[in-house]
């Protein structure tokens, strides 16, 4: 593999792992099978709980046995989760699907960036700049998928899920064919400390990095609210009188807005807009619960712009702060662990977001 092929395969493996084809219609799909709002909340809890339980063990395991193995397992579990949605379309089938998806999410969170970072170092590719490029390409690709998701759903509710399974399978195939981690890195992993010692070392790195703590505090807390609102946008649309036929196109615009957020992050001459996002973001929630179409659409624009901007900012900062590849997966899993706690806390203490 050369530098060009390394960039291309990392890009394709990431892009085809998208869930954008079924995300816009997921709530409609569950409502189609007589799921209530409280049922959807419970499924979200199952997903979060599974991610919480497996987050740290999966990161530690990735550092021990190899990130590629764990990334392959993650993609396989994601496919199994989607198959559960299609083959067992009732409450307990959905519970199983979210349980598996939560485990898959935990396996991926630490392994994916660590594995790609190791490959990029091996082939002299700057991963942080590549990741920003991938994010922009992914948003454009996801725009197309979201635009046709409701069309596929109207033909058959299962089509968006089967389409995602095909894309995930392509991503899995690409990852399987990618090189193994460097021998020196794997050798160092074999000599790494035990779980308790690793936890102390990694926590020490996080606690002593004040800039990281502030970014995590703001980004994770705020985006936790945005993520939860994303689950209930469909309910907001219904109360605002927005028809199901245009929900898909509305969701598809999220990708364009997210791409704009990345553009704002990249450009230093947008300082006023960056500060404005910070100021107006809290008011977006008031706009949402007004159920007035113009205000709802403006609120979504603000939230999606903020979501992509601050997530990209935190992602790149975390990647650049990794100074030891032998514990990089566990380091990222620890940060994801804090993220899960933040999301769960928001979910439990801010019931007003269950619009």
Describe these PLM feature segments.
Residues 1-2, 181-214:
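Juxtamembrane intracellular "pre-TM" segments in multi-pass secondary transporters
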Residues 2-52, 211-250:
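Helix-loop boundary and gating motifs at the non-cytosolic
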Residues 51-53, 249-268:
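Transmembrane alpha-helices of Major Facilitator/SLC transporters
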Residues 70-83, 274-287:
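Structural signature of the two symmetry-related core transmembrane helices
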Residues 93-108, 297-310:
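Hydrophobic core of transmembrane alpha-helices in multi-pass small-molecule transporters
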Residues 101-138:
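Cytoplasmic helix-loop-helix junction between adjacent transmembrane helices
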Residues 160-176:
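Symmetry-related core transmembrane helices of the 12-TM Major Facilitator Superfamily/SLC fold
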Residues 346-352:
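Conserved small/polar residues in nucleotide/adenosyl-binding loops
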